[in-house]
Each structure stands twice: as C-alpha cells, then as structure tokens.
C-alpha cells in the first residue's frame, strides 16, 4: 500500500533520540510520523533507570530549554534526585534522577500522544526509498510505503543487533525485541561507513532476596532538586533510597575463572564497548590492582521489586553471573530476575554527517543516537532534537541550525563526533567543553530558550515562564546593587553578626555576594529577598564567576574569527602549498566546514590552518578580480 499522506518528517525509532526528534519536528508545525516496532516501548529505558549525571544533565537541561520532553519526564518519573559535585564549582555540578521505568515511559508516551502534528504508527521500517542522492520515504515490514521530505533514523542498538550471554548468541535489538536486519542491510548497500560497537547491561535482582542491612544507604537530596526548568517538586512521586555494596576478591576470582567463556575475551564480540561504563569483567582485567569495585543497587520502580545493580554489567555465562552475584556482600541469597547480556550492533562513522546530522551522501536523511556511535539516553535525546529540528527546517527549505561549542554541550557533542569521529561509544563529560563556565546547568535556558522560541520549539507557557524568570533576575540584581551595608548601619551590623566577616567600608549587597564564603541565602535573609531559589542561584553564579566568564567570552570572540572563515565544500587541499601529505589526507577525510573545525582535527597544526586560510583568501581575491 502507498500511504496517501505525505509527511514533512518521518522518524524511525521510538527511543530517546526518536521521541525528541519527532516531538521537535511536530512542535515546529511539521507533519510528522513516528514509526516504532512497538508502541508499548516508546521512551523505554533499555539499560540503567536514571537520567542525568556528570555532563549528561547539562544535555538534559539543554533539551529542556529547547522545549524537549526528557527533563519533565524525569521529574514525573524520578524516585530519587541528587546533585553530584555539589561541593565543586557551578560549572561541573550535575543533577541525577533515579527513575521509575514505568512512570518515565508513561510520561513520554503521554507527551507523544498529545502532541499536535504527530502521528504514531507501529511497524518496523525495512527499507528507505532513495531516488538519486535524496531520500523520499520509508517502506515498512508490511510493505506500506510512507513518503516524506526528510527521514530521521534513530535505531539505537537494533541495526544488526546480536545479544551475547557467554558463548551463546541470538539476534535481538534488546532483550525480548527483534533486531532490524533488513534496514541494516539496506544501509550497508548505500555505502555508508559502517562499524560495530557493543554495550551491556547487568543481571536484574529481586529486592526481596537482598540483605540491605549490611549495605550503605544512599538517600536522595533534601530538599529535592528538579530536572526541568518547568519542573516542580510536587511532580515527584514517592522518593526512595539506593544502596551501595562492593565486589571482593572472591567475586574477582569467579570472574577470572569464567573469562574463557566470555564473548569479550574469546574474540566472539568484535565491537568496542564503552570506555567509561566498562563491564565487570573489563574492570577486573583493566584494574587488576583493585581489591573491590562499588555496586549501586538502584530500584527500577515503585511498583516492582526489581533492582538494577549498577557496576556489574556483564556478558559472562549465566552460571558465572549467578556465582558472582551471590559472592557480593548482602547478595548471598540474591535471586536473578533477568540475566545480564552484551549487545553488538551497527553504527555509522559520524564523520560522514554534516553538522545538522544530515548524511553527506543522502540528502534529507538524518542520523541520531547510538547509530552515530554515542552511548547514553541524554546524548541520544540531544542528537534527536537537533536532527528533528533540522529535518523540519529542511522540509520547509529553511536554513538549518546547530549550536556552536560555546553555546551548548549539544554543540560540543556534535562537533566532537563530526570533527574527531569515534571508534568507541562516545559519552559526554564536562571536561570535553572548553567553555564550561558558560555552559552550566543553571543557565541552559538563558543560552537556548530564546533561540528555541525563534525556531518554533518553545511554546507560549514555557516562554512566559522564562521571560518571568529573567525579569526577576534583572529586578533582583538591580535591587541588590542599590542596597547598602556600612560598618555602622543596621544591615552592616547584621551582616557582621550573621557571618563573622569583616566590614570596613560601605558595600552593596552585590559586592557582599562576591565574597567567597557568602551565599545568596545569607544575602536574601539580610535584605529581605523573596525571589525563587532558581533566580537566586542564577544571580549568585553570575556575580561570583563574573571575571572568569568575561575571560571566556574573550576566548570565544577569538574563536569566532576562525568560525566565520568558511571552507568551501569543493575546496582542493592538494593545491595548498606546504601541507604535509598526512595533514592533507586528514582534511580531505573530515572536510571541515570552517577553519575553527579544521583546527580541532588531531594532528592539524596551527601552521596548517594558516596555510589553508591564506589559500582561501587567495582564491577569493582571484574570483573578485576575474
């Protein structure tokens, strides 16, 4: 059947990338179709039941600032919230939400089903319709043809997915779900640069068989933080504890004894696993000097006894999994509900993409999520939103948009993938960003919500809330600049009494806030401030880090000069005099779009960038005089 409706955007896959892509396109007013192999698994958390963490929560806040669904779903489904790095600087603080899988998934599905301009259809996609070098639509498993101006592919681990438990293997995109074999084959036919990666998950444990009394209790923070700028603590369901235990020498001996049947150590798995989320067998091998490793027992939800033992991801045979689990303190009688496994899947070299996440080879075809070599819900969601908004803009022949490295962690993510490529699952960290003082969790809305409004991603309710917040920040900052404390006035005396600090001359409340040991809470008490915690936090960070932030703005201004120098798409690097063969080859492989991107390619020297710039200028002069 040839489906009668022509869509602006078709999104294949209903995971974290797919849902954000579909919602973004639909919010922008495009007729959008979300194809999923199973409506019941929309927004499913395939691995750990958590959203956020170091570097990752920054992405979640950016998705949220652009009107995305992930942060609000985390607030509606979060059963424990914590601020990580709370004693460190504002740039590296991160929010983490332990999520109830069922509640999180329900929140995502509710958002999808109530989104205007969005149709959902349950069918696996088997084929892409490509005419010349342009995608025209999709053919499903049943042979239904859907036509579209653009297609976003967010297939997760389903492309050619193979599940491994010990030396046993089976086809699967996730435990209990079939892989996408036909689509994987079709993509290989299109001559896109394909590789194999792997990821894994731990065995799930029945909480009733665990002795928590011998473990360390890990409660959430109180008062509980929220993930979304539109979130509220009243959205949170019941809050629960997590628990910490450790592996031991006996555990490690059991694992070593099973390595001869490990698919990772017998060459059965060829795909590279995530460096920063290694399996337990990988930890034992790589960190052989360590006597133990932490295991975090995380509840999967409020209405289930299932626990996620974070830290023992494994693909060892089940009999070895059984022994290693029962060797851990507090888990001597543990009952395994589901075995751990590894999954190997196809991904495509992200260097074959444009910055909009459109493939260079096929016009109108966009990739997002694990298909691009990333790992994590947050990385997937960020790419999905960007791919969805750019597919939507292309569908209406509008100029596409991707944030720069100084605008968002999303920009860092995309630039890293396309400039550097990846041969292992890519995970976001704050350390990957040069301008992390400017790219904080708390100011994601300041950086992106105005842009999101212009793009059509941000609705009236969010926009009104953002404007109200920014007006409050402005008003309160101005007020504090005109409230004065002096050694002999009541406010000055109260300040000295409250803080024990010296006050030798008259200071504004803003000047007092600049002091290292003074926080906004103290200033609020001193001056009778009634603004929200969010507004107070923004003011405090802006005041305390003003000098550092100004220096970063100067660095960004220098970088922008390189960003503004575009490299023509057909630029011939072979004619650049003085470039080494190695650097020429690297530039021809990546084909950077700007001099700034060229400067970030490993091995490309500042001198080489200078030579390219000189050649571009010469070419431009020649064109002008011709």
Curated annotation (Swiss-Prot):
FAD binds at residues 13-18. NAD(+) binds at residues 273-287. It is found in: Cytoplasm. GO terms for biological process: tRNA methylation; tRNA wobble uridine modification. Its cofactor is FAD. InterPro entries: FAD/NAD-bd_sf, GIDA_C_N, MnmG, MnmG-rel, MnmG-rel_CS, MnmG_C, MnmG_C_subdom, MnmG_C_subdom_sf. The keyword tRNA processing applies. Keywords: Cytoplasm, FAD, Flavoprotein, NAD, tRNA processing. GO terms for molecular function: flavin adenine dinucleotide binding. Homodimer. Heterotetramer of two MnmE and two MnmG subunits. Belongs to the MnmG family. NAD-binding protein involved in the addition of a carboxymethylaminomethyl (cmnm) group at the wobble position (U34) of certain tRNAs, forming tRNA-cmnm(5)s(2)U34. This is tRNA uridine 5-carboxymethylaminomethyl modification enzyme MnmG. It comes from Acinetobacter baumannii (strain AYE). The lineage of its organism: Bacteria, Pseudomonadati, Pseudomonadota, Gammaproteobacteria, Moraxellales. The gene is mnmG.
């Amino acid at each position: 059947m040839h489906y009668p409706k022509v869509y602006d955007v078709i999104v294949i896959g209903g995971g974290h990338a797919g849902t954000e892509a579909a919602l973004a396109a639909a919010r922008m007013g495009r007729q959008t179709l979300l194809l999923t192999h199973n409506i019941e698994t929309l927004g499913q958390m395939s691995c750990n039941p958590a959203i956020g963490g170091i570097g990752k929560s920054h992405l979640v806040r950016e998705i949220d600032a652009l009107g995305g669904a992930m942060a609000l779903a985390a607030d509606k489904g979060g059963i424990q919230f914590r601020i990580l790095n709370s004693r460190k600087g504002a740039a590296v603080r991160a929010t983490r939400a332990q999520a109830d899988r069922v509640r999180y998934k329900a929140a995502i599905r509710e958002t999808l089903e109530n989104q205007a301009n969005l149709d959902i259809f349950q069918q696996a996609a088997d084929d892409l319709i490509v005419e010349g070098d342009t995608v025209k639509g999709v053919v499903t498993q049943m042979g239904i043809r859907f036509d579209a101006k653009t297609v976003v592919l967010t297939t997760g681990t389903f492309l050619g997915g193979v599940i491994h438990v010990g030396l046993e293997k089976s086809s699967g995109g996730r435990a209990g779900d079939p892989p996408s074999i036909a689509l994987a084959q079709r993509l290989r036919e299109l001559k896109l640069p394909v590789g194999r990666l792997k990821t894994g998950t731990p065995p799930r444990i029945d909480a009733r068989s665990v002795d928590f009394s011998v473990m360390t209790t890990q409660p959430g923070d109180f008062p509980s933080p929220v993930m979304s700028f539109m979130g509220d603590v009243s959205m949170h369901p019941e809050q629960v504890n997590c628990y910490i235990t450790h592996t031991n020498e006996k555990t490690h001996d059991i694992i070593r004894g099973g390595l001869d049947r490990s698919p990772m150590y017998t060459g059965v798995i060829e795909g590279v696993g995530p460096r920063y989320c290694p399996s337990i067998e990988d930890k034992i091998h790589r960190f052989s000097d360590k006597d133990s490793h932490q295991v975090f027992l995380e509840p999967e939800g409020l209405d289930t006894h299932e626990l996620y033992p974070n830290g023992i991801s494994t693909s060892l045979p089940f009999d070895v999994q059984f022994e290693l689990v029962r060797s851990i303190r507090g888990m001597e009688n543990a009952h395994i509900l589901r075995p751990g496994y590894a999954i190997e899947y196809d991904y495509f070299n992200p260097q074959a993409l444009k910055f909009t996440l459109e493939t260079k080879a096929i016009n109108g075809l966009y990739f997002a999520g694990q298909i691009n070599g990333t790992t994590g819900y947050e990385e997937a969601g960020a790419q999905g939103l960007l791919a969805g908004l750019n597919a939507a803009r292309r569908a209406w022949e509008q100029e596409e948009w991707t944030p720069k490295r100084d605008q968002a962690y999303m920009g860092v993510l995309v630039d890293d993938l396309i400039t550097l490529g990846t041969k292992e699952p890519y995970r976001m960290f704050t350390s990957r960003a040069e301008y992390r003082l400017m790219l904080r969790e708390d100011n994601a809305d300041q950086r992106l919500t105005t842009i999101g409004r212009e793009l059509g991603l941000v609705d009236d309710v969010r926009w009104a809330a953002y404007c109200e917040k920014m007006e409050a920040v402005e008003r309160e900052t101005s007020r504090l600049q005109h409230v004065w404390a002096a050694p002999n006035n009541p406010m000055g005396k109260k300040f000295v009494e409250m803080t024990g600090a010296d006050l030798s001359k008259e200071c504004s409340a803003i000047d007092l806030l600049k002091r290292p040991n003074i926080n906004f809470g103290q200033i609020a008490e001193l001056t009778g401030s009634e603004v929200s915690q969010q507004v107070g936090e923004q003011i405090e960070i802006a005041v305390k880090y003003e000098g550092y932030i100004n220096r970063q703005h100067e660095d960004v201004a220098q970088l922008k000069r390189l960003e503004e120098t575009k490299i023509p798409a057909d630029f011939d690097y072979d004619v650049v005099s003085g470039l080494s063969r190695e650097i020429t080859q690297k530039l021809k492989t990546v084909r950077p779009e700007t001099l700034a991107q060229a400067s970030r390619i490993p091995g490309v020297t500042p001198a080489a960038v200078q030579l390219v710039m000189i050649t571009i200028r010469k070419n431009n002069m020649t064109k002008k005089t011709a």
